[in-house]
Amino acid sequence: MQSYASAMLSVFNSDDYSPAVQQTIPAHRRSSSFLCTESCNSKYQCETGENSKGSVQDRVKRPMNAFIVWSRDQRRKMALENPRMRNSEISKQLGYQWKMLTEAEKWPFFQEAQKLQAMHREKYPNYKYRPRRKAKMLPKNCSLLPADPASVLCSEVQLDNRLYRDDCTKATHSRMEHQLGHLPPINAASSPQQRDRYSHWTKL
């Protein structure tokens, strides 16, 4: 018995569990003694039984409200009557039916929900509702994949062409205004050639 105790003490005091020390312990005792050590990351987790993924509060469900209390049986009934109806459509129908109920018809379900909430507060006094963050949806025109170099080059060329056409249009328009500003004003005494020339420039 003394040799077993000294062997166990040397094992827990050493950082590496050497095979020589483990051989001094019987097989059935060694398996039961090291079961917790091998499965847990630390002695604290083995003693307390806590899970590293989260506390118990993260797994606690919210207390049901009046609508959920009412819709439990109604949803089951509607699903049995309409086996091909989708769950989303059932939810829409239940929401519409709930709105059509009077306050007197809703009141028993509000009372039941208040009782459930009181029981929930008593059972989980430190409970706080933490809604899950929804993943941000990317816009339809936004993509994480890199754009094709050929398409980028093509779009740049098209943009340059548009800018070039706009610049040419502005330059032509300003040049025409400049030329029209130097034309003599047309009047009734002007010759037919002058009137034709003026109409030609104004049509451009």
UniProtKB/Swiss-Prot annotation:
Keyword Lipid metabolism carried by entry: no
Region of interest (Disordered), ranges: 175-204
GO terms of biological process kind: cell differentiation; male sex determination; positive regulation of gene expression; positive regulation of transcription by RNA polymerase II; sex differentiation
Main localisation: nucleus
Post-translational modification: Acetylation of Lys-136 contributes to its nuclear localization and enhances its interaction with KPNB1. Deacetylated by HDAC3.
Bias (Basic and acidic residues) ranges: 194-204
Disulphide connectivity of cysteines: none
GO function terms (MF aspect): calmodulin binding; DNA-binding transcription activator activity, RNA polymerase II-specific; RNA polymerase II cis-regulatory region sequence-specific DNA binding
Keywords assigned by UniProt, alphabetized: Acetylation, Activator, Calmodulin-binding, Cytoplasm, Differentiation, DNA-binding, Nucleus, Repressor, Sexual differentiation, Transcription, Transcription regulation
DNA-binding region, residue range(s): 60-128
Subcellular location: Nucleus speckle; Cytoplasm; Nucleus
GO cellular component, one term: cytoplasm
InterPro entries reported in the protein's UniProt record: HMG_box_dom, HMG_box_dom_sf, SRY, SRY-related_HMG-box_TF-like
Highest taxon of source: Eukaryota
Kinase keyword on record: no
PROSITE patterns with a match to the protein in the record: HMG_BOX_2 (PS50118)
Record family assignment: Belongs to the SRY family.
Function in brief: Transcriptional regulator that controls a genetic switch in male development. It is necessary and sufficient for initiating male sex determination by directing the development of supporting cell precursors (pre-Sertoli cells) as Sertoli rather than granulosa cells. Involved in different aspects of gene regulation including promoter activation or repression. Binds to the DNA consensus sequence 5'-[AT]AACAA[AT]-3'. SRY HMG box recognizes DNA by partial intercalation in the minor groove and promotes DNA bending. Also involved in pre-mRNA splicing.
Name used for this protein in its record: Sex-determining region Y protein
Gene: SRY
